[in-house]
């Protein structure tokens, strides 16, 4: 009986040491979605909005029940698996200013660690990213 209790306790510690925040897909899972973004350059007179594909959605995560007793569990984020780069040209830029802005286009996505070198790892923003200059919508990609 003591051995059975010991095995049960071990099983509980291993399996209940963390709790899944969701048992099923309550939100859309990590995938490419269309998003409208803005690009501007301080030296150019207008801001350009364009539509691209970004990675967004839910990644299953785990939270420790006993946070002091166990090390923290890395939280995965929805990030690029495959991507390509596209560009837009900002009109009206003065000579000597590069008018081309490049941006990533998500081809496929995955849940994984956030890499600051290629992703914005911040949480939700109080206000969406917006232009400081007057917008000029819908320019074609280069």
Swiss-Prot record:
It is found in: Secreted. Its main location: secreted. Keywords: Disulfide bond, Glycoprotein, Hormone, Secreted, Signal. One of its GO terms (molecular function) is hormone activity. Gene3D superfamilies: Cystine-knot cytokines. GO terms for cellular component: cytoplasm; extracellular space. Residues 1-21 form the signal peptide. InterPro entries: Cystine-knot_cytokine, Glyco_hormone_CN, Gonadotropin_bsu, Gonadotropin_bsu_CS. Belongs to the glycoprotein hormones subunit beta family. Promotes spermatogenesis and ovulation by stimulating the testes and ovaries to synthesize steroids. Heterodimer of a common alpha chain and a unique beta chain which confers biological specificity to thyrotropin, lutropin, follitropin and gonadotropin. This is Lutropin subunit beta. It comes from Panthera tigris altaica. The gene is LHB.
